[in-house]
Swiss-Prot record:
Signal peptide: none annotated. The gene is atpF. InterPro entries: ATP_synth_B-like_membr_sf, ATP_synth_b/b'su_bac/chlpt, ATP_synth_F0_bsu_bac, ATP_synthase_B_chain. PANTHER family: ATP SYNTHASE SUBUNIT B (PTHR33445:SF1), ATP SYNTHASE SUBUNIT B', CHLOROPLASTIC (PTHR33445). Gene3D superfamilies: F1F0 ATP synthase subunit B, membrane domain (1.20.5.620). It comes from Nocardia farcinica (strain IFM 10152). The lineage of its organism: Bacteria, Bacillati, Actinomycetota, Actinomycetes, Mycobacteriales. Belongs to the ATPase B chain family. This is ATP synthase subunit b.
Length: 186
């Protein structure tokens, strides 16, 4: 500071230590202008380019994220649709199986009823055949017994077989009709 005072005393003017000399101001303005031109010409375009690239990447990332989200949403909807279709298919298969089971059950019941009816009919036919066989055997047995009893009662031989057979048949027919009227024997 002493130097400024000495210089100011020599020049004869009052020098303010806060205000620089004119040549310093000129050179400072020139340096600032050069730096501004360099910044404007080189630094700012590169900075703008980097910022634009970064913004593009961010926007591209956002677009990709939106596309991925839309694709994920579409995939989710397809999955839900497939799941709903699978549930409908499963319900249809269950219903088909239930219907088929009912048809099989009805068919088995019908077959069982037919088999039962066949067995009952065969049983009735067998019973009727046995009844007819027993009746035939009984008629001949009753006929012989009647002839034997008649011979014992009369004391002589009844030899006319045609008359014997006709008499026995008439007697048995009357017996059958009287049994049928009463409901006995059947």
């Amino acid at each position: 500071m002493y130097e400024y005072s000495v210089l100011a005393a020599e020049s004869g003017e009052d020098v303010n230590p806060l205000i620089p000399a004119t040549y310093d101001i000129v050179w400072s303005v020139v340096c600032v202008a050069i730096i501004a031109v360099v910044f404007y010409k080189y630094v700012i375009p590169r900075l703008t380019k980097v910022l634009n690239e970064r913004a593009d990447k961010i926007e591209g990332g956002i677009a990709k994220a939106e596309a991925a989200q839309a694709e994920a949403q579409q995939t989710l909807e397809q999955y839900q649709q497939q799941l709903a279709d699978a549930r409908l298919e499963a319900a249809r298969i269950r219903e088909d199986a239930r219907t088929q089971g009912q048809q099989i059950l009805a068919q088995m019941r019908a077959e069982a009823q037919a088999e039962s009816d066949r067995i009952v009919a065969a049983g009735h036919a067998q019973l009727e055949a046995q009844r007819q066989q027993i009746l035939t055997e009984l008629r001949s047995e009753v006929g012989r017994t009647a002839v034997d009893l008649a011979e014992k009662i009369i004391g002589q031989s009844v030899s006319d077989e045609a008359k014997q057979a006709a008499s026995i048949e008439r007697f048995l027919s009357e017996l059958d009709s009287s049994d049928a009227g009463i409901g006995v024997g059947r």
